Amino acid sequence: MRVLPATLLVGAASAAVPPLQQVLGRPEEGMSFSKPLHAFQEQLKTLSEDARKLWDEVANYFPDSMDHSPIFSLPKKHTRRPDSHWDHIVRGSDVQKIWVNNADGEKEREIDGKLEAYDLRVKKADPSALGIDPNVKQYTGYLDDNGNDKHLFYWFFESRNDPKNDPVVLWLNGGPGCSSLTGLFMELGPSSIDENIKPVYNDFSWNSNASVIFLDQPVNVGYSYSGSAVSDTVAAGKDVYALLSLFFKQFPEYAEQDFHIAGESYAGHYIPVFASEILAHKNRNINLKSVLIGNGLTDGLTQYGYYRPMGCGEGGYKAVLDEATCESMDNALPRCRSMIESCYNSESAWVCVPASIYCNNALIGPYQRTGQNVYDVRSKCEDESNLCYKGMGYVSEYLNKAEVREAVGAEVGGYDSCNFDINRNFLFHGDWMKPYHRLVPGLLEQIPVLIYAGDADYICNWLGNKAWTEALEWPGQKEYASAELEDLKIEQNEHTGKKIGQVKSHGNFTFMRLYGGGHMVPMDQPEASLEFFNRWLGGEWF
């Protein structure tokens, strides 16, 4: 969860950051980006004078350290298992051939979308071999994009309660470039991993009343692998649509249930795109009912204005930054906003990349240099090698065990919690600052949207998330923005009446502030997170 120096655990603004911050402090250890930048020189001649100046400034940040790393991720070492290993293989080319009669008696494809290049491999996992939720059905496998040599790993857990009727949820971590298996084992999955690298049962798992799919995406993240790369959110959305279409084709019993997409951090980019991709297909077997975004990065123009307030004592916790630093951030904000506005207007990497780098250095870098955890303003960064959390190291060690990789059918030679090359790819393609929040009004016309935020997070803080939801232009904006935050209390157990946060809602739009939660609310406040999750799936706010 460190900002990675460009990546966040669950990531979001972390990705481009650490390296950024390190560049300012120790240039020799800074981001090695000049290789792609040098390749841009001819293209720079075609840009406006202002744009050229921005790129010149970016290059000056890393004068000597830019030739050491490629911008594209290297392929992972892997060994593909034979088809005989898998219980089922769903061929997208076969699904593509299925035609049905519509209400008017006309022939049409049963499932829309370009699926012919995709296959889905499925294996029923043996929970007893892993010691993880042994009483629930589990499936693991890969989505294969055969035309582009891409292979996405997923892990499905059936609901502990009533799988024939409970909803299905897709969970996504962020980064970009961080594995969703981190969310599985550190936040909301059926087990966590302790210091002895052993699974520990989680009473507050989100599969208590829902079946959950954890997906390692984009490619080359976690157990996923590829000979090619994905470097923007829109491209990743095509893969997710294919996976869900083929998964629900194989398991029609789950396709009958309500389906929701949830995620955190950079999933604030992913989810508006992925949900829009699904809803764009008229004939689909994905029963999408809502989306949930936790501590997300969605509207940089609005959210970057709240780093100074959060770090300087205006977010409900004591100040981390001194007055001089706070003033410096105030002075940097107008230029940052101007650069993001230019990115929003052009959506060009030539404009969006400098905006990301300048704003992250100016508004996230000062906080990082304090040594405080960017994911939790209350604590120091305890383990820089694992994005501030020792638990992430435990998860990586567990998922790198040969017996675990064998049990889940993983095909890669090793597991990494975050792939920083992917992080850089997204950054240098301008994806970081693009205005994906503009897709949210279209979602609100069709499905409910929940934005929730742990109030101790810095990197994707609750102030910025509340602000962008109130600034969003949609038919219900006035009523939503004027709605007051109300107490959110536990209703479902012996702690009934306990205040766990605040909530405001109008129409299909809801915002929640969760008390005492950092960037990863389910990890910090497991009881509160399961409370609001179950009530949201039950339709309380929509």
Swiss-Prot record:
Disulfide bonds join 178-418, 312-326, 336-359, 343-352, 381-388. Keywords: Carboxypeptidase, Disulfide bond, Glycoprotein, Hydrolase, Protease, Signal, Vacuole, Zymogen. Vacuolar carboxypeptidase involved in degradation of small peptides. Digests preferentially peptides containing an aliphatic or hydrophobic residue in P1' position, as well as methionine, leucine or phenylalanine in P1 position of ester substrate. This is Carboxypeptidase Y homolog A. One of its GO terms (cellular component) is fungal-type vacuole. InterPro entries: AB_hydrolase_fold, Peptidase_S10, Propeptide_carboxypepY, Ser_caboxypep_ser_AS. The lineage of its organism: Eukaryota, Fungi, Dikarya, Ascomycota, Pezizomycotina. It catalyses: Release of a C-terminal amino acid with broad specificity.
